[in-house]
A protein has these predicted regions:
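Solvent-exposed, charged/polar functional surfaces in cytosolic regulatory/catalytic domains
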Residues: 25-28, 32, 99, 103-110
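Proline-centered turn/helix-capping motifs that create local helix->coil transitions or kinks
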Residues: 72, 108-117
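Helix-adjacent hinge/juxtasegments
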Residues: 73-107
Length: 192
């Protein structure tokens, strides 16, 4: 996938393409990490790359539950959403995120009108009391916003772990040739 979204022909394709791009850059922050690095929280916050990916997978699924008006996870699940459980690995949360992305795209493909009302769940303190419904369009824009926000967090966490930044990670993941201005990321040599 390129570093920017290619031209698109319509709104639905644009929204899904921008969401896919943000998911991609979030997943890139995990490229080459070990499971222990993926759960490391090397900054002042408790955020980890693996935890951010899991949170976005759970959050995106929850928003699609809201769109479809089906029950969503509990607050306990939300609270644990930033942490990998004892049976979870980086590979398992990346797989979960891929499955959630495919579910989202299938759900959105099945909705005729992006203006379709999405009832605002009641009793959530950070949701507005004076808004009764969002639209599917609004939900997709919000997912793009949230994914971009957390991809930025993950960039900082990743750079703190081993100095890796977005474009060298992308170059390594996509096998770009080295140039005088861009060197693909390489795992640091392990001292023996």
């Amino acid at each position: 996938m390129a570093g920017i979204v290619p031209p698109v022909a319509d709104e639905r394709t644009a929204l899904l393409a921008f969401l896919a791009q943000q998911r991609y850059v979030l997943r890139l922050t995990a490229y080459g990490l070990t499971d222990s690095q993926a759960v490391a929280a090397p900054a002042a916050s408790e955020l980890s790359v693996g935890g951010l990916i899991k949170h976005m997978a759970c959050g995106e699924r929850s928003w699609m539950d809201t769109v479809l008006e089906r029950p969503s996870g509990s607050t306990d699940e939300y609270d644990r959403g930033f942490e990998l459980g004892p049976d979870e690995t980086l590979a398992s949360v990346l797989d979960l995120y891929e499955r959630v992305a495919a579910e989202t795209e299938a759900i959105v493909a099945g909705i005729d009108d992006l203006g379709q009302a999405v009832p605002v769940p009641q009793g959530v303190p950070w949701f507005p009391d004076d808004v009764k419904a969002w639209s599917v369009r609004w939900v997709l824009l919000h997912l793009i916003e949230e994914t971009a926000r957390h991809a930025g967090h993950a960039d900082i966490v990743r750079e703190t772990i081993d100095g890796a930044t977005a474009f060298p990670l992308m170059a390594a993941a996509e096998n770009w040739p080295a140039t005088e201005w861009m060197q693909p990321w390489q795992a640091p040599a392990v001292a023996r």
